[in-house]
Each structure stands twice: as structure tokens, then as C-alpha cells.
Amino acid sequence: ILNDEISKIDRILPVVKALVGEGVICSVDTYKAEVMEAVLGEGAKIINDISALTFDKRSLEVIASAKASVVLMHMRGDPHNMMAHTNYKDVVSEVWEYLDNRIKVCVNAGINLDCIAVDPGIGFSKNTKDNFKLIDKLEFFESLPCSKLIGISRKFGVNKVANNRLNESISLGISSIRKGINILRVHDVLETRRALDSWLIERNQLK
């Protein structure tokens, strides 16, 4: 294990232990198999991988063996050069095809389909136009045979300060749910939950 991986594990494990001890379902963002093994061993349930389990050869095996849940995100390149890879012909169909392929790879590796969620990767290797094309066509992803997650919280808005984009985040979140998204990744959990509850009441869907 490289020193930076050891350092990350040392930083994360106490937090994971504390959250799991409080009964919280814990998700960890990582694309490194060693980190996955460590946090899953302490009770984390979900791995969120921006590389869709492609950066580390062992990651597929680790997730399958642990019977963990995983979020597969679309991204071209890596976090350092991803914005040099925005030359899409059809961003919606290309992202769909990538995620569809990664689902199949994961299932073939022994990961249960019920444990997989996909994320179109808003803001990752996409320019503003691409991002809004994806948001506009989210219903296109309903045909993928697993849960769908999106992270758009605080990414867009008239205010340049990300912390002041609550209204836009809630609006886009509700729109995403209406288009078939199952999971919202948000900063403002309480406010988003209240807005969703209000919308569900209006739609007579609250049980």
C-alpha cells in the first residue's frame, strides 16, 4: 500500500467506525481497492467510485467479495485531465453506453445488480452544455437496469458562491426525480427532504 493510501485509510477509518457505530449507512468515495477493503471491513456499505471500478484492477473483486453496493460514475480521463476530454458527438448516448457496459462488467464479475447504482457524472469531463443536455434527457437512462444517482447539488445557479445555490439545487433535484432518478446526492439534506416531501404530497405519492 502506498503511503498516500495508508494516510487516507488512517484518516477515514475513525470516521467510518463512528458512523457505523451510530447505525448510519456509510458511503465512501474512493477508486483504490486497498481503501475499499479497509472501509468495508469496518462496516461501510457503499463505495462511490468516480472511475466506475476501472482505475484499480482489484476493485471489481473487492466489491464482489464484500457484497458491497457501488456507485459507478461516468468520467473520461482522470480528475486532473478530465476537462480535456469533452469532445462528445452525442453526450447522452455515449454516457448511457459507457454505464451500460460497466453494469455488464460488474455483473459478470459477481456483483449483484441490486447493489449497483449509476451516475452520469455531471461536471466530470463535461462542459456546461453537455451537463444540461444530460439533465434534460435523464429519462433516457431509465432503461438501465439498476438504480440511478445524480449529484447536481450546488453545481449550478445564478450565484457564483456555491453555498448560495439551494433553490436551484432543489429545483434540479425534484426535476431529476421526476425523470427517473432514484437517488440524489446533496449537501442540504434537510431542505431537500422537505421539498421532496412537499412535492410527493402534491403528487399523492407519500405513504
Regions found by a protein language model. Name each.
Residues 1-26, 31-34, 40-41, 45-105, ...:
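Active-site-adjacent loop and "lid" segments of alpha/beta metabolic enzymes
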Residues 112-115:
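Short acidic capping loops at alpha-helix termini that bridge into adjacent secondary structure
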Residues 122:
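Active-site metal-binding loops of divalent metal-dependent hydrolases
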Residues 107-109:
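Conserved C-terminal portion of the radical SAM core fold
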